[in-house]
């Protein structure tokens, strides 16, 4: 093999997909409850997304950000009007979006004081794998091989108001938070915690940054999770589902955080016409009347089925999440990797996460019968462990 050994891969090579199903080169069908890790929000090969990409590829795939392009302008308008009316910077990935947010936070602080540069983020958070976002990621297991990290970061206990309050000071320029911690095992923030984070950022003149790379783009039943909580950030990062499978990330800032000027930041590929056309299509689909309400209903249905399963199987320690972003945590005697492997062998794809958890992240277009099949398959796996 010519690929670097950076992933623990399952033994399948996929060649095509349709809806909630993905097929390997032998023709085996798998029920995909990973969505490419929260990416394929419209499922595989959604006809309107495919048509939009084909059409744009025939017109203009890429042009420099030294010029304007219509899909980029349209997507920025859609993101702004469907959030808090901010300005948008486009990147290619979630980690790129978070790196941009770090630079925005640092410049915001520097405009206030040379000493206002500290960034606070949560223990067990995940913000990306490039050096700045890795430093913001409060997980030493990812950080240790790449030390020394970027200076000026400190960590607080997630959902612990008192710890966040202790860490706040006048030299803090930003607080980074995932409204729902994804990689650490689907851990939602409490409303009280996010409300207090908002108050503290206002009190200390710091930016509140919400990383919605995984929990955004309709996954919770709202376009963005902050809309479920009613707590509005200064900076919002998104990626994954934004392109429906095409790489794209974005940062949305309010007027307060709109500090970048020409030369401060940039990207070659971010905001290219092809990716933005995909993003426009995704947002138009997600914001169609009734779509997000149905996501919430499906999420409630899935949660109910999984809670019933928890009562039936002692090895299940917890079920938590929001919308179609749900974590199933197992007791110590069962390995989440073993469960994920057995699910794979039974043609169900799930994502292992921290805290001995697997993630259910189906396409937002998943059908109720497919939800039933996924839960029944997981039950079958647990019976054999």
From Swiss-Prot:
Which residues of the sequence carry a binding annotation for N(2)-acetyl-L-ornithine?
129, 267
CDD domains found in the cross-reference section: OAT_like
Q: Which residues carry this modification: N6-(pyridoxal phosphate)lysine?
A: 240
Keyword check for Ribosomal protein: no
- Protein's cellular compartments: Cytoplasm
Q: Which domain of life is it from?
A: Bacteria
Matching PROSITE patterns: AA_TRANSFER_CLASS_3 (PS00600)
UniProt-annotated binding residues for pyridoxal 5'-phosphate: 94-95, 126, 211-214, 268
Parts of the chain that traverse the membrane? none
Q: Quote the catalytic activity from the record.
A: N(2)-acetyl-L-ornithine + 2-oxoglutarate = N-acetyl-L-glutamate 5-semialdehyde + L-glutamate
Might you give the EC number(s) for this enzyme?
2.6.1.11
Cofactors that this protein relies on = pyridoxal 5'-phosphate
List, in alphabetical order, the GO biological process terms annotated in this UniProt record.
L-arginine biosynthetic process
Presence of keyword Amino-acid biosynthesis: yes
Comment on bound cofactor:
Binds 1 pyridoxal phosphate per subunit.
Q: A single Gene Ontology molecular function, please? A: N2-acetyl-L-ornithine:2-oxoglutarate 5-aminotransferase activity
Family listed: Belongs to the class-III pyridoxal-phosphate-dependent aminotransferase family. ArgD subfamily.
Q: What else is known?
A: May also have succinyldiaminopimelate aminotransferase activity, thus carrying out the corresponding step in lysine biosynthesis.
* Name listed for the protein in its UniProt record: Acetylornithine aminotransferase
Which organism is this entry from?
Thermotoga maritima (strain ATCC 43589 / DSM 3109 / JCM 10099 / NBRC 100826 / MSB8)
